[in-house]
Regions:
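Extracellular, repeat-based ectodomains that mediate carbohydrate processing or recognition
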Residues: 1-222
């Protein structure tokens, strides 16, 4: 019955903030906001580690640090949040960020994003959480062209397997997807596949926890 919302707080200098919510029946209550980045913060995306109670990661664009792609570990206790140190996953202009933990490997997650400092390619990196610190492996390109609205999800039935869905700007704005496989901190990708031969916006992906290798992509068909 606990969840976290991460956001840009425009009433607090655009700082990145997060808050714990508690569900009781059909009612919600919230704790106090806790700032995770005391500078202009865009595209915050939060994901919990399903293997570690109360542990989550926020990935975001840190405008106050040259728009680098950055992530931080948070730990929930009651309705309070404590954070570790920030870790950079892309020393370049990053946006359209999504992240997901591997349900089969504690402390392991993937972050996907558009790397504006590398021709706006769709890019991914593996993060490893140890305590309240994050280390990242190398960056891996899954689409050597402009990739918007990137979203990733792991298959909970297959360790290390995930899907990325995105808008392929150089392919008429079509919706494309690709399978990634994690081994340690390296990622290998399969071929890309079109799931919508039309203008595609805001794709999201979810895997069926009861059926291996099955997932659904929802999107705006514009």
């Amino acid at each position: 019955n606990k969840f976290v919302i991460a956001y840009q707080d425009s009433d607090n200098s655009n700082y990145g903030g997060a808050i714990v919510g508690t569900i009781s029946g059909t009612t919600l209550s919230f704790g106090s906001e806790v700032v995770f980045n005391s500078s202009d913060t865009y595209n915050p995306f939060v994901t919990f580690d399903p293997n570690t109670a109360g542990k989550f990661v926020v990935a975001y664009k840190d405008v106050g640090n040259s728009s680098y792609g950055t992530a931080i570990v948070g730990a929930v206790s009651g309705t309070t949040i404590t954070y570790g140190s920030e870790s950079v996953f892309n020393s370049g202009n990053s946006a359209e960020i999504s992240a997901a933990f591997d349900p089969n490997t504690a402390g392991k997650f993937v972050v996907v994003y558009v790397d504006y400092s590398n021709s706006s390619y769709g890019t991914a990196a593996v993060g490893t959480v140890s305590g309240t610190t994050i280390s990242f492996g190398s960056e891996y390109v899954y689409n050597s062209a402009t990739s918007y609205y990137n979203y990733c999800a792991f298959d909970p039935n297959t360790a290390g397997k995930f899907v990325v869905a995105y808008r392929a700007e150089s392919n008429s704005g079509y919706g494309e997807s690709v399978v990634g496989t994690v081994s340690g901190t390296t990622i290998s990708f399969g071929s890309t596949y079109v799931f919508n031969s039309g203008q595609t916006y805001y794709p999201s992906v979810s895997s069926d926890p009861n059926t291996a290798n099955k997932f659904v992509i929802a999107y705006k068909d514009g």
